[in-house]
């Protein structure tokens, strides 16, 4: 395979959302459900596209290749939560030469429940993966074969101060 010019790993192209015929929707938010599991239970991970003789298109450079496949006798799980009470963010981080992306999923689960407390206990310090789907049908993978996603914190559980306040758990 010929050496790839690092300046040509990804080919620039025009970006015009008005011409994005395949993706007409632009609804904000995520669907009120995520798929999750333990990092150690994954047999095969999707990965970044490989360098080729010709530069990757912008779309190829922004898409993982392959599927997430669980190990035998392991499974992924689903968490449903209150609609429009979760947010997924991708932010740039790092200094020049060390840039990367930080993904943050913030879920508010209406009503304090034993099951949510159990989830918090089961995931403390554990490497995880989460699959988040936005309202336009795009899937995002938190955690990969190199590093698992970690539950960073939460605003805790609260009953609220008044009878009209929300009884909830907040997870990050």
Task: Please give the residue ranges for each predicted region.
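Viral virion structural and adsorption modules
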Residues: 1-7, 172
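Solvent-exposed edge beta-strands and adjacent loop segments
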Residues: 3, 18-102, 149-166
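Context-gated lysine
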Residues: 7, 50-51, 71, 78, ...
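Conserved binding-pocket/active-site segment within a compact domain
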Residues: 103-172
